[in-house]
């Protein structure tokens, strides 16, 4: 049995458009993104009870005050509202590149395509997500939506 090369490790999640930095194992954020894309409620099993969650938008006038949570119940409410108000037709992952920053911290560049309910049009977005995981659960999530472009 041969060890995987670094290039093979980087491509372990290519089926979901997710790549990782060299030398990493599957981070929780990669699993969370796959479940999010699939609309799979198993996503909740990857979230810590005391999750610190927030989505920010760069130069966007959208009301995002509700896009934060400090516990798993609040996260479930945000996730439900995202599904209803932002992603009513789901989302498609175009790319996700995750880098292991050490000590449970990860940085992900995330690209997705979705029907954006706010503008009633197909859109693509690029975001940067900083996460922390401990004991197989994500306990910190900060997403900065840098662009939402109608296509």
Q: Would you name each region that the model predicts?
A:
Residues 34, 45, 77, 81, ...:
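Charged/polar, solvent-exposed surface patches and flexible loops
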Residues 2-49:
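Short, low-complexity N-terminal intrinsically disordered segments enriched in polar/charged residues
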Residues 49-96, 101:
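A solvent-exposed, acidic/Ser-Thr-rich amphipathic alpha-helical stretch
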Residues 14, 20-22, 29, 53, ...:
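A generic structural signal for ordered alpha-helices
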Residues 4-20, 83-151:
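A beta-strand edge to alpha-helix "cap/lid" segment located at domain peripheries
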Residues 25-26, 43, 65, 100, ...:
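Alpha-helical interaction segments
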């Amino acid at each position: 049995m041969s060890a995987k090369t670094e290039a093979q490790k980087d491509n372990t999640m290519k089926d979901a458009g997710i790549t990782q930095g060299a030398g990493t194992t599957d981070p929780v954020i990669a699993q969370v993104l796959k479940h999010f894309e699939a609309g799979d409620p198993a996503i909740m099993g990857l979230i810590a009870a005391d999750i610190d969650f927030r989505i920010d938008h760069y130069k966007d006038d959208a009301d995002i005050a509700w896009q934060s949570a400090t516990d798993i119940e609040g996260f479930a409410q945000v996730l439900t509202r995202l599904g209803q108000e932002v992603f009513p037709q789901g989302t498609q992952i175009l790319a996700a590149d995750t880098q292991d920053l050490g000590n449970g911290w990860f940085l992900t560049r995330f690209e997705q395509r979705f029907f954006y309910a706010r503008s009633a049009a197909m859109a693509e977005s690029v975001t940067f997500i900083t996460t922390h995981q401990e004991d197989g659960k994500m306990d910190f999530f900060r997403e900065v939506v840098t662009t939402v472009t109608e296509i």
